[in-house]
Amino acid sequence: MTKTTIFLSFAFALANTSAYAAGDSQKGKSLAYTCTGCHGINQYKNAYPSYHVPKIGGQNEAYIISALNAYAKGERNHPTMGAQAKSFSSQEIADLAAYISTQKPAH
């Protein structure tokens, strides 16, 4: 194989990898306790600022990843969510999203 062939093979392989690591829902389950403290309580509202906390069970996996990354980067503003999101690695965010997306939506 020539250097060019090796390089092109490597570049092609990288181009086809996912932007996010595949999430492991079992690992996500062990991390989700921190989410259910707010997102698992019916009619829960934050003390400050005061607004309804949404239920997230069954939410789209890609949306959860996007939202948590946005909180971590400060693109979405909420002190609690920003701190929570920053505490997770990219893999842990993917794991959480994989787990939460498989849960039944709250009624």
Predicted regions and their residues:
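N-terminal alpha-helical segment
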Residues: 6, 47-49, 77
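Electrostatic cytochrome c docking/interface patches
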Residues: 16-32, 44, 52, 104-107
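Gly/Gly-Pro-rich "capping" loops immediately C-terminal to redox-active cysteine motifs
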Residues: 29, 40-72, 82
